[in-house]
Amino acid sequence: MKKLALLGSAGVIVVSALVACSSASDGPSLPPGPDKDAADFKRDGSGYDSATSPESGLGELLFRPNSVYSGTDGTHTFKVPVAVYDADADLTVTASDAAGITLAKTTLKNPVDPDGVTDNGKYFLITAKKAGVYTLTATSKGRSTTASVTISSYDPARYAAGKARYEAAGSGPDRPCTTCHVNGGAIDHSPAALATATDQEIGIIITTGVKPGPNVIQITSEPGTLHKWNVTDPQKDGLVTYLRSLDPRGFQ
């Protein structure tokens, strides 16, 4: 694949623009300087750009993605999607600890992407119940494959702090996140788009306007303006939690 795919080919997960308040597109890599330094954090194997997955369903049983992240605070519901490719009707998907995460089958609202490619993945929504690292195992046609699910523990107060900043303007010219992610282009930054992003990575996008690569995220309607916001640490942590709690977009 051209980029590490988040899920399949239906285009429901477009992540080059996500997290706190913008319609964005990739810009060039950062030049040397403080912003570049801020973006040079250690990668942990995750990635969160979706792209068409041409090899999906061509003979290899696999999860897409094979490593996802979510959280739980004991109060709100947190879900994250995952798909299995090249599975037959005998597909079974199990979790290493059914008390920690649960699985429910789901389907895409629009399984055919703008290029006419049909996403043939079998989708599941994972609901987080308790913090921990879990293994999903998919079995079909005598083959097995696995994926990891990392669930973080959040203080319930983080949700309220994140929701407040999401819906209200920040300091200076910083706008509410709803300006571009609910209204305007309604750019997806639900768990469908952020499944493979760690909490650290989401926080870096919010505060630096840079996504792993690193690539600069620019607001397309405002040339030269980065997707970079002034937030306090509680607001940043709250936004991470709140975004994790959104309903994954693009599913029935």
Predicted features and spans:
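Electrostatic cytochrome c docking/interface patches
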Residues: 148-171
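The canonical Cys-X-X-Cys-His
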Residues: 162, 169-184, 202, 239-243
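Beta-strand-rich structural segments
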Residues: 59-91, 136-138, 162-165
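Axial heme c-ligation environment in periplasmic c-type cytochrome domains
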Residues: 184-194, 208-246, 251
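A short beta-strand micro-motif common to beta-rich folds, especially ectodomain repeats
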Residues: 130-142
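Low-complexity "stalk/linker" and mucin-like segments enriched in Ser/Thr/Pro/Ala/Gly
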Residues: 58-66, 95-122, 214-216
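Extracellular/luminal low-complexity segments enriched in Ser/Thr/Pro
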Residues: 118-131, 226-228
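Bacterial Sec-dependent N-terminal signal peptides
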Residues: 4-8, 12-70
